[in-house]
Amino acid sequence: MKADYNTYYYIAASKHFLTQEEPLEEILREKTEHFIANNKSIDFWIFDSTKLNAHSPNEIKTLQKTFFFPTILIISSNKKFITWLKLRLRYIFTDKIQLAIKL
């Protein structure tokens, strides 16, 4: 049986940079409040490379290994949201990934 793949978009950056030098918590809190106020489903997920475990998607674990430092990934099915984050944050990497699971 062939798995269905879904396209997700992501940003990746140093964990230290996103948690210590950028207002990531504030940005995500504002976006979450916006989603709730507009009755939209929250469609982003945060993966911390230092906290991945056996239950984490294999594709995410493989992607995290491409970075040589502790990394935060923010993944969404909403390309506009990732573009918005890219404009708000500095020193980040963006791309897309095909996942055989639905987040």
Curated annotation (Swiss-Prot):
UniProt keyword Chloroplast, yes or no: yes
Localization in the cell: Plastid, Chloroplast
The organism's place on the tree of life at top rank: Eukaryota
UniProt keywords, alphabetically: Chloroplast, Plastid
GO CC term, one of those recorded: chloroplast
Listed Pfam families: Ycf54
InterPro entries: Ycf54, Ycf54-like_sf
Family the UniProt entry places it in: Belongs to the ycf54 family.
Protein name: Uncharacterized protein ycf54
The species this protein was found in: Cyanidium caldarium (Red alga)
Gene name for this UniProt entry: ycf54
